[in-house]
Regions:
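Terminal-region recognition feature
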Residues: 1-200
């Protein structure tokens, strides 16, 4: 996330510049995930999720996701945090949720997974590469297959599709409109305005 907007706020009687994302984090329990998912992105998202879970009994946290994909292991870290925090987690796709981004969209609390009207969602099989000795490559390929099966099983759990269907659809890039993502079970509704009003 390159440019971070700042706003002036009166804190303890003095005007201070505050990151808009930090302000939204505390005021509206909102987290933003933008760009490819890596270990740094995951660390921030997980820390914010647990922080919000600890400081308040508020029943919901919102994660806005605009993501082309990224590291599977980093994505799993965010996924586990979403599943483990006490509050419900509403995931909102803004722009694009592809690959691991789509996985995180689907991982939100059932009934609270939202896509904005012009969003695009894409699932596919994980990509990976291997090199070295043949035996090591065979070990790595088997590991990649296990990862693929685990992702398919998890997507099946969250979408209501069969693992066989998920496997078939994700063999190649499978793009969906907002309407198609809802029909597929990756999201529950197309509704941006109502989600913002819920914070007020």
């Amino acid at each position: 996330m390159g440019l971070v907007p700042h706003v002036a706020e009166n804190i303890n009687g003095s005007d201070q510049m505050t990151s808009l994302f930090d302000r939204e984090l505390v005021k509206n329990r909102t987290i933003y995930i933008s760009g490819p998912i890596d270990s740094a992105t995951a660390l921030l998202a997980v820390a914010k999720l647990y922080y919000l879970s600890d400081i308040s009994d508020d029943p919901i946290t919102i994660i806005f996701v605009d993501c082309p994909g990224g590291s599977v292991t980093a994505g799993w870290a965010i996924y586990d945090a979403i599943q483990n925090v006490a509050c419900e987690v509403s995931t909102v796709c803004m722009g694009m949720c592809a690959s691991m981004g789509a996985f995180l969209l689907a991982s939100g609390t059932k009934g609270k997974r939202i896509v904005t009207p012009n969003s695009e969602v894409m699932i596919h099989q994980p990509s990976a590469g291997t090199q070295g000795m043949v035996t090591d490559m065979e070990i790595n390929i088997e590991h990649f297959q296990r990862v693929k099966r685990r992702i398919n099983a998890t997507l099946a759990k969250h979408t209501g599709k069969s693992e066989k269907q998920i496997k078939k659809d994700s063999e190649r890039d499978h793009w969906m409109s907002a309407e198609e993502a809802v029909a597929y079970g990756l999201a529950d509704e197309i509704d941006y305005g109502a989600q913002r009003r819920e914070c007020d």
